[in-house]
From Swiss-Prot:
Residues 1-30 form the signal peptide. Keywords: Disulfide bond, Glycoprotein, Hormone, Secreted, Signal. Heterodimer. Glycoprotein hormones are heterodimers composed of a common alpha chain described here and a unique beta chain which confers their biological specificity to the different hormones. It comes from Fundulus heteroclitus (Killifish). This is Glycoprotein hormones alpha chain. One of its GO terms (molecular function) is follicle-stimulating hormone activity. It comes from the Eukaryota.
Length: 125
């Protein structure tokens, strides 16, 4: 004979399972449907900065250039003060020409031309 307590326990477990299934399906459905391999960064070019383009357009350099990493040659490792097994090279999308402008009392740079060059944040000052 099945008691009422056993039946209630089964109903609670089924309810929790259905609720969990609902949340998982909802999360899967809200995830963007795209192929992650096609998310390559665009070519280095001027792009409209929507945050600062209120009364007039403000452009910033956006996009990718190239980067690569490879094993450091043994001869180079021996000459390093702090040996590193991996060497990396990178070029970033930076402004070739720009000028300062004010947007709501904030000084920003409006880029006029972009190119691939040394990444500033990799440089030692």
């Amino acid at each position: 004979m099945v008691s009422a307590v056993t039946t209630m326990g089964c109903m609670k477990a089924a309810g929790v399972s259905l609720l969990l299934l609902y949340f998982l399906l909802n999360a899967a459905d809200s995830h963007p449907n795209f192929d992650s391999s096609s998310m390559a960064c665009g070519e280095c070019s001027l792009g409209l900065n929507r945050l600062f383009s209120r009364d007039r357009p403000l452009y910033q350099c956006m996009g990718c250039c190239f980067s690569r990493a490879y094993p450091t040659p043994q001869t180079a490792i021996q000459t390093m003060a702090i040996p590193k097994n991996i060497t990396s090279e990178a070029k970033c999308c930076v402004a070739k020409h720009s000028y300062e402008t004010k947007v709501d009392d904030i000084t920003v740079r409006n880029h006029t031309e972009c190119h691939c060059s040394t990444c500033y944040y990799h440089k030692l000052i």
